[in-house]
Amino acid sequence: MKNVTHSFVFLAHWPFAGSFGLNTDILATNLINLTVVVGVLIFFGKGVLKDLLDNRKQRILSTIRNSEELRKGTLEQLEKARIRLQKVELEADEYRMNGYSEIEREKENLINATSISLEQLEKSKNETLYFEKQRAMNQVRQQGFQQAVQGALGTLNSCLNTELHFRTIRANIGILGAIEWKR
């Protein structure tokens, strides 16, 4: 209680032209202290965040490269299917009189199968990119949250003295006791 009243007395005797300094009392922080804390967090946190984002970017680029390689393989399969289709068309000219409709069905089946394969690979690539992006964003959020919590705990631990700590514990026990009493 002495620290709290001391803070109010200090505010009552605020000098009109004083020196610049940091206020270490967490209950009496001001805009300058908050700006300094945010600046320090940004200064030290941006390197870690940049590294995380660079790692994620490399993973995503690797996934894109893998997807492109799969796409190239599929295009090669498509080209082989087109060559096969050309052969089938040549055979169709020879057998036109006997089985034109059956050859046409095989042609459509080949085109449909290749088209479905391409669509599935494209869908798979897009889903992989989406999930990698979501995972990267979740990991960055989680690490940012952990850093913020660690910073807040460090600030609280450095600012709490033993007397204030015991008063806070007693007040919380009193609140919990009141809650239990109401039940």
UniProtKB/Swiss-Prot annotation:
Q: What is the lineage of its organism?
A: Eukaryota, Viridiplantae, Streptophyta, Embryophyta, Tracheophyta
Q: What else is known?
A: In plastids the F-type ATPase is also known as CF(1)CF(0).
Q: Spell out the subunit comment.
A: F-type ATPases have 2 components, F(1) - the catalytic core - and F(0) - the membrane proton channel. F(1) has five subunits: alpha(3), beta(3), gamma(1), delta(1), epsilon(1). F(0) has four main subunits: a(1), b(1), b'(1) and c(10-14). The alpha and beta chains form an alternating ring which encloses part of the gamma chain. F(1) is attached to F(0) by a central stalk formed by the gamma and epsilon chains, while a peripheral stalk is formed by the delta, b and b' chains.
Native source species: Zea mays
Family, per entry: Belongs to the ATPase B chain family.
Q: What is its main location?
A: plastid
Q: What is its biological role?
A: F(1)F(0) ATP synthase produces ATP from ADP in the presence of a proton or sodium gradient. F-type ATPases consist of two structural domains, F(1) containing the extramembraneous catalytic core and F(0) containing the membrane proton channel, linked together by a central stalk and a peripheral stalk. During catalysis, ATP synthesis in the catalytic domain of F(1) is coupled via a rotary mechanism of the central stalk subunits to proton translocation. Component of the F(0) channel, it forms part of the peripheral stalk, linking F(1) to F(0).
| InterPro entries reported in the protein's UniProt record | ATP_synth_b/b'su_bac/chlpt
The question of whether Plastid is a record keyword is answered with yes
Q: What membrane topology does the UniProt entry give?
A: Single-pass membrane protein
Please provide an example of a Pfam family that matches this protein in its UniProt record. ATP-synt_B
Q: Where are the transmembrane segments?
A: 25-45
Q: Where in the cell is it found?
A: Plastid, Chloroplast thylakoid membrane
List the molecular function annotations (GO) for this entry: ATP binding; proton-transporting ATP synthase activity, rotational mechanism
Q: Which UniProt keywords apply?
A: ATP synthesis, ATP-binding, CF(0), Chloroplast, Hydrogen ion transport, Ion transport, Membrane, Nucleotide-binding, Plastid, Thylakoid, Transmembrane, Transmembrane helix, Transport
Q: Does the keyword Transmembrane helix apply?
A: yes
Protein name from the UniProt record: ATP synthase subunit b, chloroplastic
Query: Looking at the UniProt record for this protein, which Gene Ontology cellular component terms does it annotate, in alphabetical order?
Result: chloroplast thylakoid membrane; proton-transporting ATP synthase complex
